[in-house]
Amino acid sequence: MLLLDCNPEVDSLKHLLETGASVNAPPDPCEQSPVHLAAGGGLACFLLWQLQTGADLNQQDVFGEAPLHKAARVGSMECLSLLVASDAQIDLCNKNGQTAEDLAWSCGFPECAKFLTTIKCMQTIKSREQPNKDHCVQVLRLKRSFGSEEYTSGKRKC
């Protein structure tokens, strides 16, 4: 509860939640949604609740920052993990051309930056493998075929 008393973003978020604001409604001139406020405050519990109610986790504010940027700016590994697990786009750039990873590095949170770098690499590898997976499915279908040309000497050809 001490955190609630000393963080103005939490007060704003608490007010929004009490008044029944839409989860994606930009409540202030900076167009920050409750998800932006939760991520920017490092409040994983509020963020999780917002995500469970259908909040847009890629919504950008007037600075072009998504909730992922806000979490990276404050070094909240918990919020970053929640957003990444919910399929937030990690390659979004703000109006200064910075990704969340860039912000984590520039704000002095190397562990968050390394986490985002790892996720980006994993997503890149996964996207490169996707066409290969389709090819593998086709090859597997061929392997399951028992045509006379494919099945010789008790072994199936690829």
Swiss-Prot record:
InterPro entries: Ank_Repeat/CDKN_Inhibitor, Ankyrin_rpt, Ankyrin_rpt-contain_sf. ANK repeats lie at residues 1-25, 30-59, 63-92. It holds the Pfam family Ank_2. Its main location: nucleus. Keywords: ANK repeat, Cytoplasm, Nucleus, Repeat, Ubl conjugation. It is found in: Nucleus; Cytoplasm. A motif (Nuclear localization signal) lies at residues 129-149. This is Ankyrin repeat domain-containing protein 37. It comes from Bos taurus (Bovine). The lineage of its organism: Eukaryota, Metazoa, Chordata, Craniata, Vertebrata.
